[in-house]
Amino acid sequence: MAESWDHSSDAASDTGSNWQWLFFLAALLTFLVPFVGGYIWFARQISYQEVSEIKKAEAIIVLTGGADRVADGLKVLSEGHAERLLISGVSAGTNASDMTKNFPQYRDVIECCVELGYKAQNTVGNAEEALAFTKRHGLHKALIIVTSNYHMPRTLLETKASLGSIELIPYPVIPERLKGRFWWNSLDMSRLIFVEYIKFGLAYMRLLARAPAKH
């Protein structure tokens, strides 16, 4: 007796499997294309050049995280680009005397025009300290924001959400170890920017969810 073979069920199974793979790949590409595109956009927002000119503002906000940031902020203050400066996120126990020891060339401006903020533990806290600082001194026009170049986009996002209509003038600081490195030719820089890109995205979604609905 001849045995009959029916391949129709196998063919249907293969077709279903192929569609599943196509659906998976389509879903993956739908996620990856905007994600990678967003990363490239974010990386291009970061400045890799030292600031040559800067507008005058009412005050300067320096976010701690490196001596370069503080030094550059004090330099901008001493050049007369603002009347006062807040260093946000200072560790407990640090005071003005420590500042003058570390930056003796800026003793005069430290003694007259620098405030230290101790409450901030992160970028959100920096924005909150900046808001309290502006209210305390009646500032409402423009601030110079000093932080590392890779940290600037998220800093501006959080600070703008906190301060509202006050103009924010970025003063990106390029850390010494990262000078001459770009996201397209340095694995370390690419990783650093990738982590910051994720943090920026999470901050953006949090602020978007918190925003009041428009009717």
Question: Which residue ranges define each predicted feature?
Answer:
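N-terminal Lys/Arg-rich, disordered targeting/topogenic segments
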Residues: M1-W19
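Amphipathic, soluble alpha/beta structural segments
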Residues: S4, K214-H215
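Residues in intrinsically disordered, low-complexity segments of regulatory proteins
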Residues: S4, N18-Q20, I40, F182-W183
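Short, contiguous, well-ordered secondary-structure segments
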Residues: S8-A11, V33, I40-A43
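Structural motif marking the loop-to-transmembrane transition
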Residues: T15-L25, S186-S190, F194
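Hydrophobic membrane-insertion alpha-helices, especially the h-region
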Residues: F23-Y39
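A structural signal for short, hydrophobic/glycine-enriched beta-strand patches
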Residues: I40-L187
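A transmembrane-helix-recognition feature enriched in membrane-embedded lipid enzymes
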Residues: N185-A213
